[in-house]
Amino acid sequence: MLVIHIISTEDTREFSGIYEGLEASVLINPGASVAKDALKEHDTVMFIGHGDGYGLYNERLNGYFVDSSWVGMLRDKTVIGIWCYAGNFADRYGLKGFFTSNFISNVSELVDCGFDRFDHADQVISHENERFSNTLNEYLKNNVPMDRWVCSLQESCSRIPYVQYNYEALYYSE
């Protein structure tokens, strides 16, 4: 598996637990040509960072790292997309794999999505990011079939409203 982790803000760093201890080639904030060359050697690729339905943002958040120009290279891959609206990107281009939708990973996103700020929100959000990451890591280590991830995650998520919001729109596509 190839992991491409675009660390643009501290909250994106919290998702490194997803690939910790896995046999994976990990690229942190790589150049596009390096990433595209590495992609040729792998059947599964995981992208982590911030983004929207049109792609994964670059580390400066002023453009895209992954956009429609990548689609041809991704069509025959299994993709794990961990960025806001990755599921929309996958659906738009017919990609297969596991994807998040709008995924609240920091306090400003919490407020932007209409949730009230609460005491210790920073710590709770960090804890839930870590919990999500550790769960995906276990699924990957134990070869849990990807088509079971969404249901399993939704059944096990905490009852905090924003967490339920995050998990309700997880997306799997074959």
Predicted features, each with a name:
Residues M1-I48, I80-I82, L153:
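A domain-level signal for caspase-like cysteine endopeptidase catalytic cores
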Residues T9-E14, G31-S33, H50-Y57, Y85-F89, ...:
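Short acidic, S/G/P-rich loop/turn micro-motifs used as interaction or catalytic elements
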Residues Y19, E59-N62, G94-K96, C113:
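Short, glycine/charged-enriched secondary-structure capping and boundary segments
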Residues V34-L39, S68-G72, D91:
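Short, T/G/N/S-enriched strand-turn elements that build extracellular solenoid repeat scaffolds
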Residues D52-L74:
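A short, glycine/acidic-enriched catalytic loop
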Residues T78-E174:
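Active-site-proximal C-terminal subdomain of hydrolase catalytic domains
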